Every structure is written in C-alpha cells, then in structure tokens.
Amino acid sequence: MLPSVGAFITPNSHPIDWVLLKVVLTGSLMETSDAKGNFTTVDWRPSADVMERLGSPSTFSADVQDIALFQREGVILIRGLFSDWVDPLRAGLQRNMDHPDDYAFPCDSVAPGGGGRFFDSYCNWHRISEYTDFVSQSAAASLAAQFMKSSRAQLFHEHVFCKEPGTQTATPWHHDLPYYCVDGRQNVSVYVSLDATPAETAVRFLAGSHKSGQLYFPRHFVDGSDYIQDDVGMSSVTRLEDNFREEDIRAYALEPGDTLLFDFRTLHGTTDTPIKTRRRAFSTRWLGDDMVYCERAGETSPPLEDLGVTPGTPMPESLFPTLWHQTAKK
C-alpha cells in the first residue's frame, strides 16, 4: 500500500508539492486531476480569539415576493444592496491576491498559455479584517436567514473571485452542493459584485435547476474536468449543458454592490467571452436549519477535514459560527 500524501507534507510545503508528490505516489498524472487548486499551507480554521470578537450583524427586511422568487428560481438579484462594502472588500481581496500563499486555498485557473488571470480563494474570512467585518457586521446573515426560510444563518465560508482583463477562461457549468461536505435544502450563497460587469461576462444561472433532485460531479475551473467521485447518484453535467434552454438562463449586468443570492444546488457558469475589465466578486456561503455534515465519495472543496462531527449532524459552531438567530430580529 502506498503511504498517504499527508505523511510527507509539512506545514511549510509549497502547494505545488502536493501535485508533484501525488504523481510520485500514484505514478499517474491522471490521479492528480482530483486536486487541481485545492491546496493550502495555511490553516483554514478560525481561532477562538477571532470567534470571540465577531461583531453584531445589521438587519435586513426581505420582501416576501423576492423570497418567493428565490425559492422558485434558485437565484435572485438585489440591486445596490452592499454598495457601502465595495471599497473595503476590494482592499481585502487585493491583499489576498498580492500575497496568495499567506492565505488559505489560493488558486489560479488559467491554463498554461492562456491570457489574463482567474484567481479565487476561500476560507479566509477570519484572516482578512475586511472579510471578517463583512460577515459579522453587514446584513448578509440576516438576509441569508430570510431567503433560506431558516431560523438561523450559520457561516460556512467565503469565496472570492477575480478575472483580470484578457482572461478567456469559462467557468464551467456546475452547482456548489456536491463540492461541499454539507447536505440539505436550506442554504444560500450571497454574491457581491465588486465591479461593473456586462451580462455577457457575468455568471449565468439555470433557473429552477435547484429543484431537479439531481447532483452533478464537481468540476475543475481550470479545464472543466470532473472531480473524481465514487458516487453512483451523481452524473456529469457536460452531457446536458448544450441543451439548456436560453429562456431558462438568468444573466444580469451588474454594478458594484449589486448582490446575487443563489441556492447551492442552482447550476451556474460563465461563457469564455474575453474579459475586458476586471471582474471581482465576494461571496459568502450560508447554512440554514436543515444543513448537516455529510461525507462525499471523493474530494471536496474546500477539503475540510477532522471536523469532529458525524454525518447527519450540524456543522460545529466552533468553526462555523451562527451569526444570525430569528430571536435577534427586532
């Protein structure tokens, strides 16, 4: 039996070591395809000190018709909701990009020879002060609870994105739930646009796809390949994407501060239309009442391990803080 990768990786190992070591151990580049960009040499876990200093979220009163639309289509746009947070979040994201190895799970998803830059990173909400302030002081938690129809909003993680001018890398059609070690129906991503973005290069959503009951293999952003998952209940979305009806696609021109809410099960992606101006976004992932830990039959992203919980139980509050309770509403 081959030794595990973890037996050779030290806290100071560079991310590329993970790829090279996996090739050595498995003797196959194909075996590394389930790990593209899913590395960190920085501990993703928040410290107890940070958890104790979290602020008090502000409130948001959601429109009942907006909630109904979200529940029906799995996505909704709210204009200008977080305009006041654009500058701080841009500043935090810039530090994240300038010093990627100082933060958890940095990833560049432009294939060799491709132009531009497609950067993303996640699980740094407790390391970057602007991210911390947003998740703990903004109305995002209150907003999330209402759209999930949940009595509480538990932070799963944040996820930041930047596509630089010249990037022509499509984000492959996918939905987020199969990437995650959680399961359930009460969930939402709160995606804040940090730049003006034309509809042709914005994220596109397949309305109603969250209701299909079908899970699709996660996909690598760098080349669109499926993760290696041993789950007979999943299928490949690549078999379907050419048949999506245009009338079911939701794509919006965005301004800084505009906010998209979408279900973890809603299929979404982008075209490979060249990026002409920066496209940055800050997304937070929220868990509601019925969300529980689950063990996927393969790699997850983020690859969160040693959580100390059993399948079917809630995610631990010590790592994933509940930032909004229904009783907190005034």
Regions found by a protein language model. Give the residues of each.
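A short secondary-structure junction signal
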Residues: 167, 171-175, 184, 200-206, ...
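Non-heme Fe(II)-dependent double-stranded beta-helix
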Residues: 21, 27-72, 77-173, 179-180, ...
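Double-stranded beta-helix
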Residues: 199-267
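Non-heme Fe(II)/2-oxoglutarate
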Residues: 31-34, 39-45, 49, 53, ...
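Short, conserved beta-strand element in jelly-roll/cupin
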Residues: 181-198
